[in-house]
Amino acid sequence: MLRKRRDTKDNVVKVTFDLPPGTAHESVRVVGEFNRWEGTPLERRKDGTWRTTVSLEPGREYQFRYLVDGERWLTEPSADDYVRNPYGEDNSIVRT
């Protein structure tokens, strides 16, 4: 699930990425244009959900995917849109 919150003080949009319990055994990273496809780790919470929040420039569109346990790619069901990537799969889109 994606949640967005405009931070007018810092002129950014804070985007929270959430995945449900059972998504991964070891790790989840959100990998996208906003982190040069390097990956930002999601933290496993006490309730088993995975979460991280990143600050993004407003008025932009970013492609991303989730990398689960270092080997499995997932798209975001609540993404703003999807675009086909060079590997024939969909990347998720978040618009700020």
Language-model features: locations:
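Extracellular ectodomain segments of secreted/surface proteins
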Residues: 1-13
